[in-house]
Amino acid sequence: MDCPHQDVLHLIKYFRKEWPVVSDSERTTICGADNMLLTLQLALAEVNKQNGKEFSVSLSDVLLTWKYLVKHKLGLACEDTVVPKDYADIQKTYDLFLKNSNSLDLIDIYEKISTAGSSEAHFLSSEQLLDFLTNDVCLSEGTDFPIVSTPCKNNLDTVKVKPTLKRIFLAYLNLLVNAKNDFALAQVLNCPERGLGREAFTDLKHTSRLKNMSIFLVATSFIRTIELGGKGYAPSESDPLRKHLKGLSLFVHFIDRLNEIFGETHDPRTAGELLLSTIKMHLIKGRGSGDPLSEAATEVAQDLDLRIKYLINLVSEDKSSGTTGISPVRPKIRAINRGTASGGRETIKTLLKLLDEEAANPPSKNKADLLCADEENTLFGAFSLFTLFRSPEQTGSSPKALSQRVQKAINKDKPKLKHNLIRSQFACTYKDSNLTQTKQWDFPSMSQVPS
């Protein structure tokens, strides 16, 4: 396989072309190799929590389960292969995460195209896709990769700032295209700082499960109800989301600003530039022009803007070269954004192509750097996915925090001191039963004196 990245991208392009046959929604986003691994990490931790353990998982368990999951989904697992513990529950939780986020992973794309009987699937075999996902590909000569290091405590250096900023920009664009994507929302909910940390995300997550809605829809409906519903429809005072009202309002209103660009800007080039510029200004607000983070955000926005314009130019060239004098096909009934302007629809299609290119990227070389994010270092207020999904609230079956368990063990080993009960400020007027009993034995009555 000369260029696995291009073969995977070709597979994704065919999926977009034939989406009415193989998918239920044109806005379905594709989960790349790195996001597949992050989703599996969350699924493993969730299963551990359901089994009464902590919401955590070791790096070795994630990597071992990852290799088996890829082989099993591709039908390449050998009969004598050791099946990871609780694998059925892990795969079920993994698939549920993707389904709730209206996403498909690369293996799902391959299976759907193969099931449809398309010859496009033969350009990429299951063994080649396995090698691509597990990093066992033959790289062409002259390919250089950056040297990665073991995660450290202070890892907010210039090398890692731009990739993190790029993920934030793409997460915002992903959320605009697919409002059901909870993983995209988790990356931008508190980015920039809005006071929406782990507690706010946990409250949103619990409410979304109770109402069977996406987290973004929960936040939007809560703000709309307060702003437009009136007193009769206002949420109760005990609603856990009320304490996050200010931050949720800022977040929802900013997404509204981005959505307005789709309706007001018909040219996809201008719309893409405005979207990236709005996100950039929102992130660097309050920072000076010479701030390193501001400069990095500007560079990332410019790079993505050039990529969007390049994709638009490719579409224009294809249309001009493929003109045959035949009238264009009428839009499909289930087309993107059919109730809005065609300009907004073209912008969303362009953003989907950009996100698809990112999904076709090879997996990261350093899995530890990807999975073991530092909880103390946050960029623009953004937390890692694993940090957010690990609920700070403990359920009845979940163990208490480690600090609480240690303190309880220390208190248990301490000798307990017995104090006499003081009944009132005039305790000296009361007779102590123990003292009375002692005096009774020390000074027996005459009847107890032996004759």
Where do the PLM segments sit?
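Conserved helicase C-terminal RecA-like lobe
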Residues: D2-S451
